[in-house]
């Protein structure tokens, strides 16, 4: 399938010692590849277990080019409800592992961020238990932060929000 962020190649390359379920290979956060291109890379680089290589056949996406806008027909996750969240995910995922919520437990997952430890922002939300997040970070606690749901499409990895939140947090020892 096409990549909804297929025009963007940006961000740090994952270091091998930090691989996990959400980051398995040494590629940039925003890699710009289709699933087929990524599969070919995995196969060609022998990244499968024991350097296994497959007899891989990839059906090309007809009339597709990387500069085309593509909207996923099915949500990839309950926490990525729309094109805006999908576009912002690569920039907001850096809040994972911090004390800042990315909106799980709200209607604007990966379109907002906030924390009870922030104060110099004019947006607030209170995460609650829902289908996509039974126990969201800061459940039932008022979070102060920023609403990004109406900003223009991001065309690069955007670290401004992470830096703003870190700068504003009242206790930097609990940020990361």
Could you describe each region identified by the protein language model?
Residues 108-176:
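Conserved functional hotspot residues or short segments at active or partner-binding sites
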Residues 33, 37, 107, 157:
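Conserved active-site and cofactor/substrate-binding residues in soluble primary-metabolism enzymes
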Residues 18-92:
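Conserved anion/nucleotide-ligand pocket segment
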Residues 2-18:
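Glycine-rich, charge-decorated loop segments at or immediately adjacent to ligand/cofactor-binding or catalytic sites
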Residues 11, 32, 103-105:
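Glycine-centered flexibility sites
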Residues 4, 64-67, 155:
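A short acidic, often aromatic-flanked loop/helix-cap motif at beta-alpha or helix-coil junctions
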Residues 4-8, 37-44, 98-102:
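Noncatalytic linker/hinge segments flanking ATPase motor cores
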Residues 62-133, 139:
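ATP/pyrophosphate-binding catalytic subdomain of soluble kinases
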